[in-house]
Every structure is written in C-alpha cells, then in structure tokens.
C-alpha cells in the first residue's frame, strides 16, 4: 500500500504547474493531525514541496483567517469553511469534504478498558470513572456536554469532568495518568502516544466531526495547494484515512 501511496504522489506531482518547489502554508484543525503526520511527509518527498502546517481548534483557526491570517490551504469543520466561502476567502470550486470522524473513548495504554458497547454501558463507564478529560471549546466538547445533559448525568459527573484546551492535550492528559478517561474525535486521539482507544461512542449517541478543505482565494501557492488536496483524496491514500479512525470523503 505504501508503494501505491508514493506512486500517487508522483503522479500528482507531474500535474503541478509549479516550476520549482514551494512552501505551502496550511491551517489545519486538530482532527486531521494524524492523517497529516503520515501523508504530509510522503507528499513532500515526492514533490519537493514543503508543508508549513499550523494546528488548532477549527473555530479558533476560522476566526484567525477571518481576521486576515494568510494561508494556501485550510482544513476545518464545515461551518468555518462555509463562512469563509461567503466572505470570499476560499476559492468557490475548492471546497472538498475529506473525511469524517466519530467520537471515541480513550484510556491510558495498558489500563483496563470499560464496556461502552451500549448506551447503558457507556453511562456506567462515565459514572464509574474517577475523571474524564475532554476539550470543551471544540465541536466535540460542546456536543459531549449536551449529551451528558441528555443522559441525565450532569450532576453525577460535575466533579469528574476535566476541561482541557484541545483534543491532543486531552490525550496527553490521559497518557500521563491524570485522567482515567478521555473523550475526543477518534482521529485526534489516535495521533497521541500513550493512549489506547476503548471504542467509538454507541451508535445511538455518536456524533461525527467532518473535515473539510478549501484553497485560499488569494493563495500564494494555489497550484501546489491544489496538488496536495488531490493527493489527500487519491484512492491510494484512502487506507491512511481509515487507519486514522475516519471515514474518507464522507
């Protein structure tokens, strides 16, 4: 599969209109970090381009772009991408749905994994946990707070919930043993060393975070950015998105 991935990169590189290597500035949500970690270096080796990537919460990154932050390609949630489209900051023909990621529960590597196979089991796991780390400011954290309220667990979990700045830091908190459970999009937690995926949330209460890309309408490296976007969507790279806990092109 790795050979196919590199072959896809080489083919895409041949399509590029750029005469020489370029620095592609990418503003990317934390949820796509794991995919970028694997496919980014492959694209760089195959094309000679360099990816200059900054990560963060989609909502925060969207505001930065609205405030004038320059970029060539951005990967955010649909609300941010669509808002930027309306403002003319993203090329209208470049909006691309890359993948979606369900939310999952993590524990420290080697720790016992609770049963979360049903809604009732999931509720028991939350109640029995000593502490639960989550990113409250992101789309997933906002959903989780609402879900806990719908499940009638707000009071039971009030002293157990540990708000953490973002998904990756949530995973790091669990990896250090400072929280027993962590709940984030699966695509974010799989990028963190020292944690293990317990499983996705039960289907009845699952929530999906969609990763959507767009090329800047004022991109300094527009052609190279579009080449990288094509590379991310190449059939030979679908397996990487799946391995990182996401569904491609959802």
Mark where each language-model region is.
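Exported/periplasmic ABC-transporter solute-binding proteins
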Residues: 20-67, 75-101, 106-250
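Bacterial N-terminal signal peptides that target proteins for export
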Residues: 1-8, 18
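C-terminal segment of classical bacterial N-terminal signal peptides
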Residues: 12-20
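Residues at the start of alpha-helices and the adjacent loop-to-helix junctions
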Residues: 2-5, 13, 162
